[in-house]
C-alpha cells in the first residue's frame, strides 16, 4: 500500500513534457488527408458509373487528352509514397493504442483527450490554407484514372466502307505484296545503328548474305520468266521436230564419242599403273629368286639326284683342271704287272712249241662243234674280278681230246691306249697287236694261222656286232664310237691272228643263227648314264673254240689311267647286270631352289656369276691383290665346297640304314605287359647358389599396382611359384615354401624325439614346419624356433 501511495503522490506533483510542449503545426495532417482521399475516390466512382450510363464518354476522352501527363512523373510518385508512409504510420498508431494496457490511469486518459482535441483545432486551420492545392491534386488524379481506363479498353477501330463494284466490271484479284529486304537499306545513314565493332561486323555479314540472296533471286526469276515465255510459244511442226531431233542426235553422238575416249584413256592409265606397280625391277637387272617347295622323295629319286650332282661336280672339276694329275699306282696293280711278266715269258715258250707241233694237228677237229655263247652276268662279274681264272662252261658230253685255247682280247684297253699313248701319225695296228696276249693253262696252244679258222672268227664277230647294232639305238651309238675309235683287225705278224673284241670274251666256236642279246640289252640301258660321266663303255662278248674247259689269262700292261677306266667299266657293268633296287615309302621333304637371272627373261650369264651376285666391283677387286684393295672393303663370307673323299672304285650303293635302337624298348607284337622304364640320374649340388635375374611377373602386382606381401618374410614379392601360384620375395622364402610342400619326412612319424633333442646330423631329415589346425583354420609352426619362457611343452 505504501508503494501505491508513493506513486500517486509522484503523479500529482510532477509535470510532463507533453503538457508543457507547444502543438505542432502539421499535427494530424496525414490521417485527415487519407480520409479525404477515400471520400474523393468514392465520389469519382459514382460519377464514372453515371457518366457511362448517360453516354458522355466522348467529352471525357477529349478532356483526358488535353490533360494527358507523362507516365514517369517523379513528383506524383513522391507524393504517393508520402501518402503510403502516412497510412502505415496511422495503422501502427492504432495497433499501439490497442495494445496498451486497460489498467491505464484516468489522468493519462484525460491528457490524451486534450491532446487529440488540440490536434483537431490545428488541422481545421491548415485545411483552409491548402484547399486550393488539394483541389488541383484531385483533378490530376481524376485525369489519370480516366487515362488508365482508356488504355485498358484499347483504341476504337473505325472500318472504312468499300465501294461496291458494278455489275459489268470484273472483280480485280488482290495480290499480297511483300516488301523484299534490300541489302542497301542496312547501309543507309538515316538508319539508327550502333557503332560497336561487333555490331558492325554482324551487319556486314548480314549485308553479304542479303546481297547473295538477291542475286540468286534475280537468276531464279529470270529462269521463271524464260520458262513462261517458252510455254507461251506456239506448237512445233513435224519438220521442226525432225530438225531438232537431228541436232540432238549429233550432240549425243559427240558426247558418246567423248565418253568412249575417256573410258579408253582411263583403262590405259589403269593398266599402266598396274604394270608399274607389278614391275618392281628394271630391264636387264639381275634378280636372285628363292623358292621353297614341298617335295615327295623316294630312295630311287635320292640316288638319281645324288648321281646327277656327282656328275655335274666331276664336269666342273674337269674344266678347272688344265693339267690333270695321274692317279697313283696301287700295290696290287704292281703285283699284277709282275705276274703278267712271268706269264708273258711262259707264253713265248709255249708259242715256240706250238709252231713245231701245229703242223701235225688235225685242223678238222675244230669244225666238229662250233658255238658262240653270250656270257651270263655272274660269269662276267667273276671274270672281271679275277681275270686269271676265267673258266668257260662246256658240257662234258661235248668234250674231245683235241682242244684249242680260249682267246680273249681286250678291246677297250687297245682303244684307250690309242687315245692316251699313240699319236695321230702312228699306226694303230702295232699298238693293238702288241697288247694282245694269248696264253694256255694245262694244254698246248696250236697255231691259228689257218685262213679258214680266221675267216670264221671274223664272220662270227661281224654277225654279232650287227645284231647288237639292230637291238637298240643306244647300242648303235656305242658301237659307232667303238668302230671309230678302234682300227679294223689285221695280222701284225705271219704267225699271230689279231681280232678286236671287247674285254672278258671267249671265242668258243662258229656263230649260230640265233644269238642271245639279253646282256647287250642290259648294257644298252646304262649307256646314257655312262656317257654323262664321260667314260667310254663297250659291250661284252665271249667266243670259244674249245671242247674242254680252258682258262684265259688276260695280260693288261696299261698305264694307271687305263686301269682306272677299266675299273669304272667293270663297276658300270656290275650296275647294268645286277642292279640293286631300293624300296621305301615316300617322304615329304622341302626343296629350296635359287635362281639367278636378268629381268625380265634374259638367260643368266654363268661366267659373270660372282659379278651379278656381288656387284660390278667384284671383277675389279678380284683382279687386284690384297694390298691394292680399298680399306673399306670387307669379306662377307667364304664359299667353299668340301671335296668328298675319292675312292678308287665308286660304290653305287648308299647307306640309308636308320638307327632303330629306340624301338627295342617298345613292346612287340603279342607283348601286352611290357612297360617302358626311363632311367633318370639326378645329381644334387648344394654348393651352387640360385641367382634370379628375371623381371618380376605380372602376378606379383595387385589391381592397384602395389606389390603383394610375401607370406614368409612379409616383404614385397618379387616372384611367384608357377606350380602353386604362391608369391615369394627371395630364395630363402622359396626354400621354405618347398619344405612346407614336402608332405613326407623320415622323422615325421616319430613321437619319441623331443624338440630339444634334435641334432645337426638328422636335422635335415626332420620336418621343420608342422601344421597345427584349429576350428576355422590353422598355422604352420617352425619347430626349430625355441619357444618363449614359461610356455608348456606341446603348446
Swiss-Prot record:
Compositional bias annotation for Basic residues: 316-329
Major place of residence: nucleus
Source species, domain of life: Eukaryota
InterPro entries per record: Vps72/YL1_C, YL1_N
Keyword line: Chromatin regulator, Coiled coil, Nucleus, Phosphoprotein
GO cellular component terms listed in the entry, alphabetical order: chromatin; cytoplasm; nucleus; Swr1 complex
Coiled-coil annotated residue ranges, if any: 28-63, 121-150, 204-281
Biased composition (Basic and acidic residues): 134-143, 337-354
Biased composition (Acidic residues): 57-92, 119-133
PTM-bearing positions, type Phosphoserine: 425
Compositional bias (Polar residues): 468-496, 568-585
Annotated stretches, region: Disordered: 40-179, 314-406, 462-510, 554-585
Record region (Interaction with HTZ1): 1-281
Single GO molecular function: histone binding
Cell compartments where the protein resides: Nucleus
One BP annotation, GO: chromatin remodeling
Functional note: Participates in the catalytic exchange of histone H2A for the H2A variant HTZ1, an euchromatin-specific factor, leading to chromatin remodeling and changes in transcription of targeted genes. Indirectly involved in vacuolar protein sorting.
Note: Present with 358 molecules/cell in log phase SD medium.
Subunit structure: Belongs to the SWR1 complex at least composed of ACT1, ARP4, RVB1, RVB2, ARP6, YAF9, VPS71, VPS72, SWC3, SWC4, SWC5, SWR1 and HTZ1. Interacts with HTZ1.
Family per similarity comment: Belongs to the VPS72/YL1 family.
Name the UniProt record assigns to this protein: Vacuolar protein sorting-associated protein 72
Species the sequence originates in: Saccharomyces cerevisiae (strain ATCC 204508 / S288c) (Baker's yeast)
